[in-house]
């Protein structure tokens, strides 16, 4: 069966997310490039790049959409107990490039979409103030973290990694707590999976997600939300 997709041109325009295919879920367009301004334009419309080895750049806007509500996120009792015992240090925006690299290198080469071109694009977005990371440290070594794109009061999570037990879960927990205190309203996780569901993610259909996106992208978090800072000191 033939699939007809829009090919992106030199402008940063995208087709409507409502034109995305249902199978494969959310596939919307192909081509273009990974210019940071194009990527950011996509996020502001609920569209993100994802493609595998040997494929053109593919752009997606799936439905339903997996999300977290920072205001209602609750870490499990076992996770809180783990953190009390191990006291991982948690920071924000102190090692974004390293986090992006580890999100790629900690996965088998044939299982990651985060190739060198994608890494470079998100590092550029970090330099422009749009891509942010949460880092988890143990004995001054980076052992877990996540990164994503800020779109007003929406945070679009991209990837996470964990080199020690629960490190990525702790990154998510502290991100939620931090965003909740800084007027952050929603975390987009793109597509649901069992791991996200176990942490409390829930789904929004396309209409509801786009409505929230259109509202939240026009609002701002506190001015110091993504200032490099310590969220949890290892000795606190």
UniProtKB/Swiss-Prot annotation:
Enzyme Commission number(s): 2.3.2.6
Molecular function as annotated in GO: leucyl-tRNA--protein transferase activity
GO process terms (BP): protein catabolic process
Broad EC category: transferase
Compartments (UniProt record): Cytoplasm
Record carries keyword Calcium: no
InterPro entries: Acyl_CoA_acyltransferase, Leu/Phe-tRNA_Trfase, Leu/Phe-tRNA_Trfase_C, Leu/Phe-tRNA_Trfase_N
Catalytic activity: N-terminal L-lysyl-[protein] + L-leucyl-tRNA(Leu) = N-terminal L-leucyl-L-lysyl-[protein] + tRNA(Leu) + H(+); N-terminal L-arginyl-[protein] + L-leucyl-tRNA(Leu) = N-terminal L-leucyl-L-arginyl-[protein] + tRNA(Leu) + H(+); L-phenylalanyl-tRNA(Phe) + an N-terminal L-alpha-aminoacyl-[protein] = an N-terminal L-phenylalanyl-L-alpha-aminoacyl-[protein] + tRNA(Phe)
Keywords: Acyltransferase, Cytoplasm, Transferase
One GO cellular component, as annotated: cytoplasm
Protein family according to the UniProt entry: Belongs to the L/F-transferase family.
Protein function: Functions in the N-end rule pathway of protein degradation where it conjugates Leu, Phe and, less efficiently, Met from aminoacyl-tRNAs to the N-termini of proteins containing an N-terminal arginine or lysine.
Protein name stated in the entry: Leucyl/phenylalanyl-tRNA--protein transferase
């Amino acid at each position: 069966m033939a699939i007809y997709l829009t090919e992106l041109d030199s402008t940063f325009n995208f087709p409507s997310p409502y034109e995305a295919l249902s199978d494969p879920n959310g596939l919307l367009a192909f081509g273009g490039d990974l210019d940071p301004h194009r990527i950011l334009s996509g996020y502001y419309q609920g569209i993100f790049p994802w493609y595998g080895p040997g494929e053109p750049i593919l752009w997606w806007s799936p439905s339903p959409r997996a999300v977290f509500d920072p205001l209602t996120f609750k870490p499990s009792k076992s996770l809180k107990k783990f953190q009390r015992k191990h006291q991982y240090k948690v920071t924000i925006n102190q090692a974004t490039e390293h986090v992006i690299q580890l999100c790629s290198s900690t996965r088998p080469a044939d299982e990651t979409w985060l190739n060198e071109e994608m890494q470079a694009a998100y590092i550029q977005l970090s330099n422009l103030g749009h891509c942010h990371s949460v880092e988890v440290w143990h004995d001054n070594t980076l052992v877990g973290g996540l990164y994503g794109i800020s779109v007003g009061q929406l945070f679009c999570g991209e990837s996470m990694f964990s080199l020690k037990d629960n490190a990525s879960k702790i990154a998510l927990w502290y991100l939620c707590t931090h965003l909740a205190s800084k007027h952050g309203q929603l975390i987009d996780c793109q597509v649901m999976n069992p791991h996200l569901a176990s942490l409390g993610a829930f789904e929004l259909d396309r209409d509801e997600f786009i409505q929230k996106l259109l509202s939240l992208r026009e609002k701002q978090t506190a001015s110091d939300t993504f200032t490099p800072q310590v969220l949890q000191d290892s000795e606190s």
